[in-house]
Amino acid sequence: MIKVLIVDDEPLARENLRVFLQEQSDIEIVGECSNAVEGIGAVHKLRPDVLFLDIQMPRISGLEMVGMLDPEHRPYIVFLTAFDEYAIKAFEEHAFDYLLKPIDEARLEKTLARLRQERSKQDVSLLPENQQALKFIPCTGHSRIYLLQMKDVAFVSSRMSGVYVTSHEGKEGFTELTLRTLESRTPLLRCHRQYLVNLAHLQEIRLEDNGQAELILRNGLTVPVSRRYLKSLKEAIGL
């Protein structure tokens, strides 16, 4: 079975695509999302083989969402849009295919045929990475979704319950992005197995006798530094 996830902010567009895909005996629709933040979480949780992704969505576009996905678990991307002006950009973002709305069933059939053929010979994890840097981190908290600009991020931490972003004001939000994705797509520096830090907010490094250290940020918060990452941290600040 080919596991499919649909991410589109238009309910009617999702329904039309769903109805057609449900007629395919080898297609399983594992989920539907109405925005990119939900979509990122669904990709990480459901691990679809194929992502049908609308390009034009509020706050975070489909093109931006692709750059936020963990490259090791990125599905085949089929972009959906009503405007063909995005075609070249879509394929720069490593799209498998590109469909114009309203979707033509014959054209979609060709896409599915190519997907079936491709899945039989290629591991999706070998698809090239999108190296474009992230300008913000999508976060959720207190029944809202917000975009935290990189300059306002103090540090990011990974816990049993997920990945959390702390702002320079000390406010905390949950993100669906992984530490691996954030490390490769942002200026944040790894200082610990469970922490990334924004050196722009660093005020002091407090060295400890056991070879570890603690970072004191400008907002007074502290971030641990493990022995493994202390050398690279010093090099990053010119020591």
UniProtKB/Swiss-Prot annotation:
Residue intervals of the HTH LytTR-type domain: 137-239
Modified sites of kind 4-aspartylphosphate: 54
Function in brief: Member of the two-component regulatory system BtsS/BtsR, which is part of a nutrient-sensing regulatory network composed of BtsS/BtsR, the low-affinity pyruvate signaling system YpdA/YpdB and their respective target proteins, BtsT and YhjX. Responds to depletion of nutrients, specifically serine, and the concomitant presence of extracellular pyruvate. BtsR regulates expression of btsT by binding to its promoter region. Activation of the BtsS/BtsR signaling cascade also suppresses YpdA/YpdB-mediated yhjX induction.
Protein known as: Transcriptional regulatory protein BtsR
GO biological process: phosphorelay signal transduction system; regulation of DNA-templated transcription
Mutant lacking the gene: phenotype: Deletion of btsSR has no obvious phenotypic effect under the conditions tested.
Response regulatory domain: residues covered: 3-116
One Pfam match: Response_reg
Alphabetic keyword roster: DNA-binding, Phosphoprotein, Transcription, Transcription regulation, Two-component regulatory system
Cited InterPro entries: CheY-like_superfamily, LytR-like, LytTR_DNA-bd_dom, Sig_transdc_resp-reg_receiver
The record's account of how the chain is modified after translation: Phosphorylated by BtsS.
Record-level GO cellular component terms: cytosol; protein-DNA complex
PROSITE patterns in alphabetical order: HTH_LYTTR (PS50930), RESPONSE_REGULATORY (PS50110)
Membrane-crossing segments per the record: none
SMART domains linked: LytTR, REC
CDD domains in the record: REC_LytTR_AlgR-like
GO MF: phosphorelay response regulator activity; transcription cis-regulatory region binding
